Amino acid sequence: MVGSLIMEEDIYLDLFLDPYTIQDDFPPAMSQLFSPGVPLDMHSLPSNPETVFHPHLGGVKKASTDFSSVDLSFLPDELTQENRDQTVTGNKLASEESCRTRDRQSQLQLPDEHGSELNLNSNSSPDPQSCLCFDDAHSNQPSPETPNSNALPVALIASMMPMNPVPGFSGIVPQLQNVVSTANLACKLDLRKIALNAKNTEYNPKRFAAVIMRIREPRTTALIFSSGKVVCTGAKSEEESRLAARKYARVVQKLGFPVRFFNFKIQNMVGSCDVKFPIRLEILALTHRQFSSSYEPELFPGLIYKMVKPQVVLLIFASGKVVLTGAKERSEIYEAFENMYPILESFKKV
């Protein structure tokens, strides 16, 4: 009787403890970060990430690797290279179009010197490269290995940079004072015979081994050598210098020499002008020593300034007078003065 009672108590005790036993088989619901009293080893993860332990099942189950049923619609579609090119091209065209629109609006609102609005032709469109519009969202920095095809040309960048000094704004035109030219008569000459028979000649072989001959129109002077070379000086233009050299050749030909006119060439041109203001030559000489400028007022009252391009030598005086020499073309005289004028203005005496 007592044994049966003990067995019944055991059965009731098992029935009473079964629910609590099942609950103890599950891992704790709270994370180990929120249960400091539990050791870390009790809830350590399995060594193989692809396996999942189920203690209440008493076994190990492989994790599923099939993601075909997962909804990935929230992820953005990856752009291909073609789509990227199309996107960049579209953004570039939109930027250029906005530049054209702003350029037309600014030109329509720009008044001329009389105050009237400019009438622009709507068919004319500005150069796309002249509109410098940059989009921060789509601009890419060019790398040294891969040059950027959208980069601005070097010539365009150079044209946007201001030149200093700026030529062509002084309003002063240097006047030619002397043109030196040479020619070859292609024959040997008897200088004594020329000096005795020609007018307006000088010949002193002890002082200078050439005949000095002068004519009135154009008023020039020629040096005639026994080798047939002629040097003509004093002309005011290239045409006058050539005409004078041919006249000297004609005079020598009339004296019986087989003269032929060859190799006429301009060797030197001298021009002068006045800037109409005094110049501080001492400071100019100190700041432009790299151009071989020399100023010795005890020896010569002017500053000698040797320009590199064009190769022209300038004699600058404190009164504002400028002499330019060493040019072989008229344009070099004008270019050298226009390059020098801003420098002279910066050293103007106040």
UniProtKB/Swiss-Prot annotation:
Subcellular location, principal: cytoplasm
Coiled coil stretches, renumbered: none
Annotated region described as Disordered, given as residue ranges: 82-150
GO cellular component, one term: female germ cell nucleus
Biased composition (Polar residues): 118-128, 139-150
Subcellular location: Cytoplasm; Nucleus
PANTHER family registered for this protein in UniProt: TATA-BOX BINDING PROTEIN
Function according to Swiss-Prot or TrEMBL: Transcription factor required in complex with TAF3 for the differentiation of myoblasts into myocytes. The complex replaces TFIID at specific promoters at an early stage in the differentiation process.
Complex and partners: Interacts with TAF3.
Protein name: TATA box-binding protein-like 2
Protein species of origin: Mus musculus
Gene (name only): Tbpl2
